[in-house]
């Protein structure tokens, strides 16, 4: 096993988003009046979503509610100190209402899932970051915002096509740190109901 992959397993894939990248995301977001639900299904210690919530420009009559899901017990306890509600669980084992969230902040674990698929397109879509996106994108309400932080190498043609079919007003920019070769994809969930 490659040392970098082994290190990822030791940390349970936990690599928090840097503050400069979070600031770049926050300055691009605006919320209207009303209740706004912000979800981080890989919330770690909750600091990223808490920072986003505190820096997002929002209407004075809007109420921001932060929700996190975290697998690691110690990190979930820390997250509960700065987020409104934290569930200690695997994001894949949770039931989150479809169309219930205004913002989905997603910096998922990265890497290939063990698969016997030989087809490259299927292999590309079996990556962890893709699986997290597919599982959690339905939690966004129509016109809700996805803030996805992934290595640019994960943006295979199949994954890019998946995102392009489901998002509109897409903006992509490099993360502030070059350490993981990450990009941020911001996009609004498209209306999938058809004409």
Give names to the regions the model predicted.
Residues 15-20, 123-130:
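Conserved phosphate-coordination/catalytic loops
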Residues 83-88:
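Active-site regions of enzymes building and remodeling cell-envelope glycoconjugates
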Residues 25-28, 37-54, 68, 72-73, ...:
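Conserved proline-anchored active-site loop of SAM-dependent methyltransferases
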Residues 1-33, 48-50:
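S-adenosyl-L-methionine
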Residues 79-80:
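Conserved SAM-binding loop
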Residues 125-186:
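Conserved Class I SAM-dependent methyltransferase catalytic core
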Residues 183-195:
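Core SAM-dependent methyltransferase catalytic element
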Residues 54-65:
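Conserved S-adenosyl-L-methionine
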């Amino acid at each position: 096993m490659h040392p970098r992959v082994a290190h990822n397993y030791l940390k349970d894939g936990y690599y928090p988003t840097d503050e400069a990248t979070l600031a770049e995301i926050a300055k691009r977001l605006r919320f209207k009046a009303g209740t706004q639900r912000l979800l981080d299904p890989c919330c770690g210690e909750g600091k990223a979503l808490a920072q986003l919530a505190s820096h997002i420009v929002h209407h004075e009559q809007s109420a921001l509610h932060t929700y996190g899901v975290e697998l690691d017990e110690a990190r979930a306890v820390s997250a509960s100190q700065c987020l409104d509600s934290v569930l200690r669980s695997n994001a894949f084992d949770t039931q989150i209402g479809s169309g219930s969230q205004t913002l989905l902040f997603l910096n998922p674990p990265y890497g290939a899932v063990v698969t016997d698929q030989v087809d490259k397109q299927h292999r590309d879509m079996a990556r962890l970051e893709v699986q997290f996106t597919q599982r959690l994108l339905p939690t966004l309400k129509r016109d809700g915002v996805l803030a996805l932080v992934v290595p640019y190498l994960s943006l295979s043609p199949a994954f890019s096509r998946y995102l392009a079919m489901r998002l509109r007003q897409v903006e992509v920019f490099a993360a502030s740190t070059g350490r993981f070769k990450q990009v941020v994809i911001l996009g609004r969930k498209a209306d999938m109901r058809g004409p």
